[in-house]
Amino acid sequence: MKLLTVAGPPSSGKTSVILHLARVLRECSGLRVGVVKFDCLSSSDAEAYEKQHIPVRVGLSVNLCPDHFYISNIEDAMQWAASAGLDLLAAESAGLCNRCSPHIRDVPAICVIDNLSGSRTPEKIGPMLKFADTVVVTKGDIVSQAEREVFGRHIRKVNPRAGVVFVNGITGQGTMSLLRQLRFPEFDTLQDRRLRFTMPSALCSYCTGQTRIGRGYQMGNLRKMDFGGAENDR
């Protein structure tokens, strides 16, 4: 069983990249690809996968941290994929916060980021870019060559080890270049394997449903800012 993790900010083009990758793998290697989509409140991506006859399951974390929800269900997702006779499972994570850390050691890891998000955005994205094997840049056809080069330089500044590939989410151009960078080891199970980096910390009173504001309601794993004195701000 082959596994691939695909992470990135919302609306960066993760689903489009997976759709093109699944098509190329099917046409070139005869591999049957399935997808497990992890999201927070809602997702309509299942329709896009089903339209291309790609088996898909969608999990919504609702009021839980999407990262913790993801890692608690990825082993079960692999078992589903194996029982469905799939050759490769692509795990698409929600990527709702830049502290998300979905990549697993030895499992090929992609981070998708779009070129319209700002030239310094790569520096603001945490483990899902820093620990990725390959960074896929989408929407690069909308910006200039100079902007693409600056964006790529900022990516390499954060993760100099990763390959950087530009993929057109509409036409699929660049998908073959992406495929050439990927290596898919076989896994029977993820039992006892480790994440590449720790997940966002928990647990505070707001994690468990507290909605009131004030120091008296703030308990658990908290971090307070030091604003210093205000004398020089007057």
Per-region residue spans from a language model:
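Short, solvent-exposed amphipathic alpha-helical segments in soluble enzyme
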Residues: 21-23, 50-52, 126-130, 151-156, ...
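P-loop NTP-binding site
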Residues: 2-16, 23-26, 185, 189-234
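Nucleotide-state-sensitive switch-loop elements of NTP-binding domains
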Residues: 2-104, 118, 140, 173
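Conserved beta-strand/loop subsegment of P-loop NTPase cores
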Residues: 34, 108-113, 129-141, 156-171
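Short, surface-exposed amphipathic charged segments that create phosphate/polyanion-binding patches used
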Residues: 70-76, 176-186, 205-210
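Inter-motif core of Ras-like GTPase G domains
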Residues: 95-116, 124-133
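Short, glycine/polar-rich helix-capping loops at beta-to-alpha or helix-loop-helix junctions
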Residues: 42-46, 120-125, 147-154
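Canonical P-loop GTPase G-domain recognition
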Residues: 141-196
